[in-house]
């Protein structure tokens, strides 16, 4: 067992490397989550989302930090945000939302997409959807961040979203809410998903209400996004099972680039699969 910033990790491998070595570059993104609390203490908020998906678990890994599908798969949610007064700007880099996004491999199979926030954050970016009555509270949280962390770090914490995959099956979505998601295979084409909301222990009832509303609106079996994703993954699984003459899932976006990878490229997806192959290939040879 190892603990990093109050995140507890357990391995059944007696020869597992030290946790901080294993987390590698993922530590930076866990730090950005924990720094949202003035005391550095976060709490799992009461309540669990639990549902099954009839698809291979690794498809949900891909989905969890794939920004390429956002504009088409979640168009209903984007239209809802626009009607609610949220400004959705045309990307300045690439051709898809969000603007300014990058994808990064973080070592040991961990990877992340990191992009500019447009959908609001309880810590601490106000949007019209929150209502005018929430603006003073968000501004207070923002001021505390700047005072504690400095302007540059506060901007990094409050104005960017991050979807982090800690290999193999832990997802930390740090956006309009913070979601802890994990999933376990029940069969080659069936997984069980569990998710929880995370928030600062000091959070006021007003900020907590915004957080939970954002969490339920986007994520979960009744949200705007998760039903879209479940339908997509189950359709992909059916297709892969039916068309066996197509042996590969192409994941080559950005492969020839030498410059920084966009969030809509697939470097971060390939990082996961390279580590998976590294661990699994000896088994196949045996």
Q: What is the predicted function of each stretch?
A:
Residues 2-286:
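C-terminal catalytic domain of Rieske-type non-heme iron oxygenases
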């Amino acid at each position: 067992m190892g603990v990093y910033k109050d995140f507890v990790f357990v391995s059944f491998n007696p020869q597992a490397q030290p946790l901080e070595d294993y987390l590698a570059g993922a530590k930076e993104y866990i730090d950005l989550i924990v720094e949202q609390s003035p005391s550095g203490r976060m709490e799992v908020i009461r309540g669990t989302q639990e549902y099954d998906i009839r698809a291979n678990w690794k498809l949900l890994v891909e989905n969890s930090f794939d920004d390429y599908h956002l504009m088409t798969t979640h168009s209903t949610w984007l239209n809802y945000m626009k009607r609610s007064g949220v400004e959705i700007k045309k990307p300045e880099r690439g051709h898809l939302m969000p603007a300014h996004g990058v994808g990064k491999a973080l070592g040991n199979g961990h990877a992340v997409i990191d992009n500019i926030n447009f959908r609001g954050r309880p810590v601490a970016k106000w949007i019209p959807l929150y209502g005018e009555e929430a603006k003073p509270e968000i501004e207070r949280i923002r001021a505390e961040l700047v005072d504690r962390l400095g302007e540059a770090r506060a901007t990094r914490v409050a104005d960017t979203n991050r979807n982090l995959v800690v290999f193999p099956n832990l997802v930390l979505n740090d956006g309009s809410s913070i979601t802890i998601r994990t999933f376990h295979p029940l069969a080659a084409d069936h997984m069980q998903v569990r998710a929880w909301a995370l928030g600062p222990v000091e959070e006021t009832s007003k900020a907590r209400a915004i957080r939970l509303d954002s969490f339920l609106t986007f994520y979960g079996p009744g949200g705007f996004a998760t039903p879209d994703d479940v339908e997509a993954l189950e359709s992909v699984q059916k297709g892969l099972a039916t068309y066996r003459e197509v042996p590969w899932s192409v994941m080559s976006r950005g492969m020839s680039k030498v410059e920084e990878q966009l969030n809509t490229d697939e470097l971060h997806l390939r990082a996961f699969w390279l580590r998976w192959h590294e661990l699994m290939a000896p088994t196949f040879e045996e």
